[in-house]
Amino acid sequence: MGRAPCCDKANVKKGPWSPEEDAKLKSYIENSGTGGNWIALPQKIGLKRCGKSCRLRWLNYLRPNIKHGGFSEEEENIICSLYLTIGSRWSIIAAQLPGRTDNDIKNYWNTRLKKKLINKQRKELQEACMEQQEMMVMMKRQHQQQQIQTSFMMRQDQTMFTWPLHHHNVQVPALFMNQTNSFCDQEDVKPVLIKNMVKIEDQELEKTNPHHHQDSMTNAFDHLSFSQLLLDPNHNHLGSGEGFSMNSILSANTNSPLLNTSNDNQWFGNFQAETVNLFSGASTSTSADQSTISWEDISSLVYSDSKQFF
């Protein structure tokens, strides 16, 4: 068993209300009131309407304090904020809006405000995404600028504090190279000196004695004995304490035609002076006094200068 019907549905009119029906219902309620019984009210007025339909028509449309027309922007914001907070509880939302019924609010929400809110949220979401993308782009640009600045500073530091290790075109001063080459090991200096002496001696002999070139084979022994005498490590050149000069070599080997001329003696003296000036850094002189410089002095200069250099 269910609840008894409020009216005879066969004799009840359905559909929209006419202006005459609205006027009858409004005038009766304003004069007599509802009486607390909406079921018996249609029979008293003479309307072929259901009691529920009369109640809803009065509450939603015919009351004197109801607002008709569109919703203001402030009302829309209140409806949206309350809907996001409590959902579709229209009676509670209508209590916050004087003059608005829950039915009007629900209809307005479903027809217009819902779409408007969705579009607004979509636009805000797009704007937030755009702002986030712009922030990401700005952060990337700042990061790239920082990387460029750091790399530039590192390059400046490398160019300021890094010594060029692989520069093959660096020009070393000639004076330093000459001094370095002059203070080499004596075992490497002696053969070069002897070779130069012999070569210059041959050139001088060809100029002074053109027929001497034919006797080169006979003079080779003299050159060899002179070279071996200088290069022999077992021979004590400086052990006797006496000056081992070029004059002693000239007097010892009298058979050689190279040592019998005054020009040769003068050439050996000049060569000694040039050799001493080469190791000491002084200018070359060809005076007759420098011809008395001994090989002992040359050896002492070579050893002392090489020790100081190394």
UniProtKB/Swiss-Prot annotation:
Superkingdom of origin organism: Eukaryota
PROSITE patterns: HTH_MYB
DNA-binding region: 38-62, 90-113
Keyword Iron-sulfur set for record: no
GO MF terms, alphabetically ordered: DNA binding; DNA-binding transcription factor activity
Subcellular location(s) per record: Nucleus
Tissue: Ubiquitous.
Keywords: Activator, Developmental protein, DNA-binding, Nucleus, Repeat, Transcription, Transcription regulation
Annotated consequence of substituting residue 229 to I: In strain: cv. Cvi-1
Any one Pfam family match given in the protein's UniProt record, by short name: Myb_DNA-binding
GO cellular component terms given for this protein: nucleus
UniProt-reported outcome of changing residue 131 to D: In strain: cv. Se-0
Ranges where the HTH myb-type domain occurs: 9-62, 63-117
Keyword DNA repair among UniProt keywords: no
Listed PANTHER family: OS09G0431300 PROTEIN, TRANSCRIPTION FACTOR RAX3
Job description of the protein: Transcription activator. Positively regulates axillary meristems (AMs) formation and development, especially during inflorescence.
Protein name stated in the entry: Transcription factor RAX3
